[in-house]
């Protein structure tokens, strides 16, 4: 089994981990609803993309709820 020959210093360990950080998420404000959303994605609030309705919400009837 492989065993390290020398102890890895805190500095070298942290330098190795410097590339593992997560990047910032780019969010924009939706012009119609004012909610935050990811760019180039459909708005989750009203189902619009590029100011066009692309997803319609299904309205549940009383039979489906019960």
Swiss-Prot record:
BP-aspect Gene Ontology terms: translation
GO molecular function: structural constituent of ribosome
Keywords: Ribonucleoprotein, Ribosomal protein
Statement: the UniProt record of this protein carries the keyword Metal-binding: no
Cellular component GO terms, alphabetical: large ribosomal subunit
Family: Belongs to the bacterial ribosomal protein bL32 family.
HAMAP family: Ribosomal_bL32
UniProt-recorded name of the protein: Large ribosomal subunit protein bL32
Organism: Rickettsia conorii (strain ATCC VR-613 / Malish 7)
Biological classification of the source: Bacteria, Pseudomonadati, Pseudomonadota, Alphaproteobacteria, Rickettsiales
């Amino acid at each position: 089994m492989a065993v390290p020959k020398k102890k890895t210093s805190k500095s070298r360990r942290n330098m190795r981990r410097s590339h593992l950080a997560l990047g910032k998420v780019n969010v924009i404000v939706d012009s119609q609803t004012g909610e935050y959303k990811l760019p180039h994605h459909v708005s989750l609030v009203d189902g619009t993309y590029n100011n066009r309705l692309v997803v319609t919400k299904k309205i549940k009837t009383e039979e489906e709820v019960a």
